[in-house]
Amino acid sequence: GNFFRF
């Protein structure tokens, strides 16, 4: 969880 919503 550090780019879009992963």
Curated annotation (Swiss-Prot):
The keyword Secreted applies. Disulfide bonds: none annotated. One of its GO terms (biological process) is neuropeptide signaling pathway. It is found in: Secreted. Keywords: Amidation, Neuropeptide, Secreted. It comes from the Eukaryota. Its main location: secreted. The modification Phenylalanine amide is found at residue 6. GO terms for cellular component: extracellular region. The keyword Secreted applies. Belongs to the FARP (FMRFamide related peptide) family. This is FMRFamide-like neuropeptide GNFFRF-amide. It comes from Moniezia expansa.
